[in-house]
């Protein structure tokens, strides 16, 4: 068949399409949080509408929650208003909510998969850019704006133009201490922050097939950072084993029936991709960003680009601006540059697999005296599992702060922020100017490299 995985899901959810209007597709799962939903609820009230299908809508608190306390009253003024508003809205419209008192609360793109809400073949939307995370399950998942949130509330549908198809096949032998975060940063460096614009990117190849679901989620999470609408991976036995016995997986069919259905969710051998890349990752070293967008990446033992070597004027100007903001110089190495904070968390790297990697690095060691380091699990269940395994003790003995679940320092929307000019080694997904706090300097990397940075208090290359 010539139909891609993306096209199969789009077509199976198509409600209406003609030459003169934007196609309308059905939405299987609508995830919401406290930041982008209030205005949408207000719009419903103004128009005297109800949420069309509350059982296909699910809410959590994550973006601006305190990670020190589970009390709403301990958060900032606006955060308190938003969380209390979410509670009221969910009660008024009969939407299930994981609030701060619930062990299942967490980052929306962590709890959806771990609860089994996200299933192969689904359409999933959320008022958040990194909804593409759910594409790791063979779902069509993408972020939407607040007006679209209201539209989905009211109709359980969305107007959505068809995207083009891009495939990125990843192959090679993964070297020691190379993780999915390194792979996706390397790809974004090659493709650029706008290379995926107008596309849904299907990730495939021998490396993807061997990845855990946690690693696949990291890959799809950052597809948006290359400008793509979404990232997607065909489901397989690894997907099915992850989902088996999850809370929200419907029980109205046998497991074999689900697998038989999901096995059809794949691109055919003759599927057409407008762009088709093959990337060998055998050679890559741990990756780190040096600038203010996720494509400004070098190996940890590499050097920042030299300005005169950059032919494109716009790219050269962006590079100059990024270097000035980051307090760095062209042609230099990041090695031995001191760091102020280390943040391990976010919807990119806050799952149990990530925390186990960090624990393996820092066990029986101490972080550097100049470092403030925090580890923020992606959900209450991740926190519970980590504590069951004794990882929290390893972290605290090493000098890390062990927090409650939330988005935390990924974005400057809660108490966890950088001070001006502080430099942070972060496992999050965006290194934009001010992303982690006004004038804060963010370097993106894997949990493994972030843990090493915490131990040494500076950027290091461990061969």
Curated annotation (Swiss-Prot):
Keywords for the protein's UniProt record, in alphabetical order: 4Fe-4S, Amino-acid biosynthesis, Branched-chain amino acid biosynthesis, Iron, Iron-sulfur, Leucine biosynthesis, Lyase, Metal-binding, Plasmid
Cofactor remark from the record: Binds 1 [4Fe-4S] cluster per subunit.
Disulphide bond pairs: none
Catalytic activity: (2R,3S)-3-isopropylmalate = (2S)-2-isopropylmalate
Assembly and oligomerization: Heterodimer of LeuC and LeuD.
Gene Ontology annotations of biological process type: L-leucine biosynthetic process
CC cofactor: [4Fe-4S] cluster
PROSITE patterns documented for this protein: ACONITASE_1, ACONITASE_2
Signal sequence bounds: none
PANTHER family for the chain: 3-ISOPROPYLMALATE DEHYDRATASE (PTHR43822:SF9), HOMOACONITASE, MITOCHONDRIAL-RELATED (PTHR43822)
Top EC class of this enzyme: lyase
EC number from the UniProt entry: 4.2.1.33
Name this polypeptide is given: 3-isopropylmalate dehydratase large subunit
Main function: Catalyzes the isomerization between 2-isopropylmalate and 3-isopropylmalate, via the formation of 2-isopropylmaleate.
Gene: leuC
Listed GO MF terms: 3-isopropylmalate dehydratase activity; 4 iron, 4 sulfur cluster binding; metal ion binding
Entry's family note: Belongs to the aconitase/IPM isomerase family. LeuC type 1 subfamily.
Binding site for [4Fe-4S] cluster: 347, 407, 410
InterPro entries on file: 3-IsopropMal_deHydase_lsu, Acnase/IPM_dHydase_lsu_aba_1/3, Acoase/IPM_deHydtase_lsu_aba, Aconitase_4Fe-4S_BS, Aconitase_4Fe-4S_dom, IPM_dehydratase_rel_enz, IPMI_cat
Pathway in which this enzyme or protein is active: Amino-acid biosynthesis; L-leucine biosynthesis; L-leucine from 3-methyl-2-oxobutanoate: step 2/4
NCBIfam families, alphabetized: leuC (TIGR00170), PRK05478.1 (NF004016), PRK12466.1 (NF009116)
A Pfam family assignment: Aconitase
């Amino acid at each position: 068949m010539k139909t891609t995985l993306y096209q199969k899901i789009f077509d199976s959810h198509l409600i209406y399409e003609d030459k003169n209007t934007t196609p309308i597709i059905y939405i299987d799962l609508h995830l919401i949080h406290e930041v982008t939903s209030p205005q949408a609820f207000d719009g419903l009230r103004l128009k005297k509408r109800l949420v069309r299908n509350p059982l296909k809508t699910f809410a959590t608190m994550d973006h601006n929650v305190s990670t020190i306390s589970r009390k709403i009253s301990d958060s900032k003024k606006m955060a308190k208003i938003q969380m209390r508003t979410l509670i009221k809205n969910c009660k008024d419209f009969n939407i299930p909510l994981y609030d701060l008192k619930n062990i299942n609360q967490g980052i929306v793109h962590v709890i959806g998969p771990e609860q089994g809400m996200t299933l192969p073949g689904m359409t999933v939307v959320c008022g958040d850019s990194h909804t593409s995370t759910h594409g790791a399950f063979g779902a069509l998942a993408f972020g939407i704006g607040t007006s679209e949130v209201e539209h989905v509330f009211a109709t359980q549908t969305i107007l959505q133009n068809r995207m083009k198809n891009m495939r990125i096949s990843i192959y090679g032998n993964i070297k020691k201490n190379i993780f999915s975060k390194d792979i996706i940063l390397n790809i974004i460096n090659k493709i650029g922050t706008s290379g995926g614009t107008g596309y849904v990117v299907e990730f495939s190849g021998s490396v993807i097939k061997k990845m855990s679901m946690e690693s696949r989620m990291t890959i799809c999470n950052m597809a948006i950072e290359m400008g793509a609408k979404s990232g997607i991976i065909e489901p397989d036995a690894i997907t099915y084993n992850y989902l088996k016995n999850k809370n929200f997986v419907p029980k109205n069919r046998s497991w074999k029936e689900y697998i038989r259905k999901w096995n059809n969710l794949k691109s055919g051998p003759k599927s057409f991709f407008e762009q088709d890349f093959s990337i060998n990752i055998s050679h890559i070293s741990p990756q780190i960003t040096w600038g203010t967008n996720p494509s400004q990446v070098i190996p940890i033992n590499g050097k920042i680009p030299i300005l005169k070597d950059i032919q494109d004027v716009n790219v050269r100007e962006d590079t100059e601006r990024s270097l000035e903001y980051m307090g760095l110089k062209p042609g230099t190495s990041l090695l031995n540059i001191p760091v102020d904070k280390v943040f391990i968390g976010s919807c990119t790297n806050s799952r149990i697999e990530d925390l186990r990697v960090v624990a393996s690095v820092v066990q029986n060691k101490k972080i550097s005296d100049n470092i403030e380091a925090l580890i923020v699990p992606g959900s209450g269940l991740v926190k519970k599992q980590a504590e069951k395994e004794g990882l929290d003790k390893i972290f605290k003995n090493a000098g890390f702060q062990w927090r409650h679940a939330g988005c935390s320092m990924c974005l400057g929307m809660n108490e966890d922020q950088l001070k001006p000019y502080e430099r942070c080694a972060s496992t999050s997904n965006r290194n934009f100017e001010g992303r982690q706090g006004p004038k804060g300097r963010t370097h993106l990397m894997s949990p493994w490299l972030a843990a090493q940075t915490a131990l040494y208090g500076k950027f290091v290359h461990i061969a």
